[in-house]
A protein has these predicted regions:
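Mature catalytic domains of secreted/periplasmic carbohydrate-active enzymes
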Residues: 1-179
Length: 179
């Protein structure tokens, strides 16, 4: 969170750096179809929703037709995924993290494009050396979640965490093969 003048200056530098990185990606890879974001849960981003709207507009101008998930956006009141008026921010909802919509209570989700993001070990994004600290889903459980998402018109993002050399651990390779 931004708590001082120094924080504010540093955050402004971060936004400028991020703008330049996004411009570089959009111009080097003009055929990209989707920009996938994460991080609007951060208080400093939620307080600067103007920048998320700016970034989305900039990318759409640089890459016409590109899709952008709802994890980029925050409105001027700090709302994420959906603005204060209930409108989806982004081209598809990406608010289901490690959970799926309820097939009875959440039927509204079928009115727009959406995705759910899931880890294989609970609460471990990216690479983690030790999987023994948490429950690891079985291939059948992952397939069940994929079927659940697809049956409600959604997409399932399954997190695999590469090692430093870019390879995947044997357990992840076995999981991908089984799926």
């Amino acid at each position: 969170d931004i708590k001082s003048k120094e924080d504010s200056i540093a955050f402004s530098r971060f936004l400028e750096f991020t703008d330049n990185q996004l411009k570089e990606l959009a111009t080097r890879y003009p055929t990209v179809k989707d920009f996938w974001f994460d991080g609007t849960w951060d208080a400093s981003v939620k307080k600067n929703g103007w920048w998320t709207a700016h970034a989305e507009q900039m990318l759409k101008e640089l890459v016409p037709g590109v899709a952008i998930n709802s994890r980029l956006r925050a409105d001027d009141k700090g709302k994420r995924h959906f603005d204060s008026n209930g409108r989806l921010m982004g081209d598809y909802e990406s608010g289901y993290e490690r959970r799926l919509p309820d097939p009875v209570k959440d039927l509204k989700v079928t009115q727009w494009d959406w995705e759910a993001c899931m880890t294989i070990p609970e609460n471990q994004w990216g690479y983690h050396k030790d999987w023994s600290l948490s429950y690891v889903k079985t291939p059948i459980e992952v397939i069940d979640r994929i079927v659940h998402a697809v049956s409600m018109g959604g997409n399932m993002v399954v997190n695999f965490g590469p090692q430093a050399d870019g390879d995947f651990r044997p357990e992840e390779k076995a999981m991908a093969t089984a799926i």
